[in-house]
């Protein structure tokens, strides 16, 4: 009798877990459509990568799009739909969004898996080192392409100096950018 009761409890727990996960997924899909529409209608910004479900320090869900051509990152807050934050690559380090290591996977409508990894650490000379990797994986076997962008910084360099290193194979494309002036660059607030 006790065995049946235990099995029933396990079954109920499993069903509840499944229902909660489905609700979370549906909520993420709704948010992704809203954010994607927002990014697509943003003047002077062309998405290279989007979008990421990020929990900010306030607990709000945010989305992120990267414009690699203009070297801009746009952060979109679900609770502040009329306001967004535009970041240059150079201010990643001072952004409150990236205070902790982040590793996020997001499933978008067009069968892409988007993953963001952000890490920061102290180097030997106490200069901060920042790494941002963005991976875009196409689920379809017809398009077996992967892309990763890594942005890193050791020492700030001149305002206009960016260091690029590109490496291409049939599956991977790497872009490394030196983040500049990460202590002085202000975050642009755009209403």
What are these regions (language model features)?
Residues 3-79:
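Anionic N-terminal interaction surfaces
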Residues 63-65, 84, 94:
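Short, surface-exposed charged micro-motifs
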Residues 86-102:
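Phosphoinositide-dependent membrane-docking surfaces
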Residues 84-87, 167:
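Short, well-structured alpha-helical interface segments that form or flank functional binding sites
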Residues 79-81, 89-93, 151-156:
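A short, sequence-level motif marking secondary-structure junctions
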Residues 97-191:
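Acidic, Ser/Thr- and proline-rich intrinsically disordered linker/docking segments
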């Amino acid at each position: 009798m006790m065995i049946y009761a235990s099995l029933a409890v396990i079954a109920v727990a499993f069903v509840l877990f499944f229902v909660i996960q489905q609700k979370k997924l549906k909520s993420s899909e709704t948010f992704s459509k809203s954010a994607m529409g927002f990014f697509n209608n943003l003047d002077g910004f062309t998405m290279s990568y989007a979008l990421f479900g990020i929990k900010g320090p306030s607990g709000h869900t945010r989305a992120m799009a990267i414009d690699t051509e203009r070297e801009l990152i746009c952060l979109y807050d679900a609770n502040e739909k009329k306001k967004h934050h535009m970041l240059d690559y150079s201010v990643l380090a001072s952004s409150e969004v990236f205070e902790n290591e982040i590793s996020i996977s997001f499933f978008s409508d067009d069968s892409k898996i988007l993953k963001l990894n952000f890490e920061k650490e102290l180097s030997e000379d106490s200069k901060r080192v920042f790494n941002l990797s963005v991976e875009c994986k196409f689920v379809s076997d017809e398009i077996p392409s992967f892309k990763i962008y890594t942005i890193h910084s050791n020492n700030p360099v001149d305002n206009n100096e960016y260091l690029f290193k590109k490496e291409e194979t049939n599956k991977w494309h790497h872009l490394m950018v030196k983040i500049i002036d990460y202590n002085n660059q202000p975050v642009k607030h755009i209403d």
